């Protein structure tokens, strides 16, 4: 979905661990220079509002001037913040885009372009963003295919978060 589409237009994906505090989320969003935030569920929130991503971004959203939209994925509680938009409305924003524009962006991607930023846990200060290129991901996919056998139609379970390299690899590539 949004992960692949972001990379297909030449933009860079950065993920945030579901355990990050509001301050850590703010730091990563600013450091990555993100323009759009896609906000989903925290599978480990146990119904506690303070653990829900929605409640971690709200306290710092006012300090994130460069954010254009916070896109709320399906079944995420809507807020009255002007930057928050639900998934269906966000998709409708692109309804006038010509498909040839999308293909042109896709064709302009260079294998050495940054595809994603993976942030470290920040055990010695603020998290550091590690750049991974499209070539990095291609290499990882090809090596993984040599070791792991995935057949079309099979199902698997991945418990790794998208903020983890292997989580991104098996869930999105």
Which residues does each PLM region occupy?
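Structural core segment of the AMP-binding/adenylate-forming
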Residues: 8-92
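Conserved pre-ATP/AMP-binding loop-to-beta segment of ANL
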Residues: 85, 91, 95-119, 126, ...
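Short gly/ser/thr-rich secondary-structure transition/capping motifs
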Residues: 17-19, 96-100, 138-139
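Short acidic, glycine/serine/threonine-rich loops at helix termini
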Residues: 83-85, 130, 168-171
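Conserved AMP-binding/adenylation subdomain of ANL enzymes
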Residues: 138-173
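Conserved AMP-binding A3 loop
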Residues: 115-139
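Hydrophobic alpha-helical segments in the ANL/AMP-binding
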Residues: 1-16, 25-26, 144-145, 166-173
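Conserved S/T- and glycine-rich ATP-binding loop of Class I adenylate-forming
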Residues: 6, 37, 114, 120-123, ...
């Amino acid at each position: 979905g949004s992960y692949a589409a972001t990379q297909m237009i030449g933009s860079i994906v950065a993920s945030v661990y579901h355990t990050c505090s509001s301050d850590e989320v703010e730091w990563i969003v600013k450091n990555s220079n993100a323009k759009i935030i896609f906000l989903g569920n925290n599978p480990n929130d146990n119904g506690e509002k303070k653990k829900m991503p929605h409640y971690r971004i709200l306290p710092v959203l006012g300090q994130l001037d460069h954010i254009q939209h916070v896109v709320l994925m399906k079944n995420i509680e809507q807020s009255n913040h002007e930057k928050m938009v639900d998934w269906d409305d966000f998709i409708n924003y692109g309804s006038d885009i010509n498909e040839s524009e999308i293909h042109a962006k896709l064709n302009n991607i260079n294998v050495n372009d940054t595809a994603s930023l993976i942030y470290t846990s920040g055990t010695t200060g603020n998290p550091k963003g590690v750049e991974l290129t499209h070539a990095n991901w291609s290499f990882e996919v090809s090596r993984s295919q040599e070791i792991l056998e995935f057949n079309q139609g099979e199902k698997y379970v991945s418990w790794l978060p998208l903020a983890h390299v292997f989580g991104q690899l098996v869930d999105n590539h």
